[in-house]
A protein has these predicted regions:
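Active-site glycine-rich loop that binds ribose-phosphate moieties when present
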Residues: 2-37, 63
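Hydrophobic alpha-helical packing residues
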Residues: 1-2, 125
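Solvent-exposed alpha-helices and their adjacent loops that cap or buttress functional pockets
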Residues: 16-22, 42, 73, 117
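Catalytic cores of soluble, metal-dependent hydrolases
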Residues: 46-157
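Redox- and metal-dependent alpha/beta enzyme cores, enriched for Fe-S-associated oxidoreductases
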Residues: 36-41, 67
Length: 157
């Protein structure tokens, strides 16, 4: 993220010939609960929209995701979703590099992706931070595939 926001070595930050490659006000990070000092610097005071687990607990996933979508799609032709599986609680997604308790539930994760898909503004999507060595019975990978399917339109009915 820092490189896309124009931070870091110019060889990387300016790779696309435009610095920043992504306007900070069009970036939303949802489900934060364990943020290191460098990450905190890359969010605070940059214009990035950051939503913690407390925001989700207090306001609900629907309100948070709608605000994130509004930010990401404001003045853009669409947005990219990079879904970090570390955001999901390790009881649901054990196969991640940084398992931290208190993450998103299975349903919160799917609801977020369903709402993103419903927006019609998602241009691309990826799932990141899956560690097969740490996974249990492929649970995290299967959830990741399911989340992509939710973003692409799979629904209960």
């Amino acid at each position: 993220l820092p490189f896309f926001l124009g931070r870091g070595p110019v060889e990387l930050a300016g790779l696309a010939g435009q610095v920043p490659m992504v306007a900070p006000e069009n970036v939303a990070s949802v489900g934060l609960r364990s943020v290191d000092d460098l990450e905190r610097l890359n969010v605070r005071g940059t214009g990035v929209h950051a939503f913690t687990m407390r925001d989700i607990d207090e306001r609900g996933m629907t309100a948070v995701i709608r605000e994130a979508i509004a930010a990401a799609s404001s003045g853009t032709a669409g947005f990219h979703v990079s879904y970090d599986m570390d955001s999901v609680d390790p009881s649901e997604a054990p196969g991640v590099g940084t398992p931290v308790p208190g993450g998103l539930t299975y349903r919160e994760a799917h609801l977020a992706m369903e709402l993103i898909g419903d927006s019609g503004s998602m241009a691309s999507v990826e799932v990141v931070e899956v560690n097969p060595v740490m996974d249990v019975a492929n649970k995290t990978a299967v959830l990741g595939v399911g989340l992509i399917m939710s973003a692409l339109g799979k629904r209960i009915l």
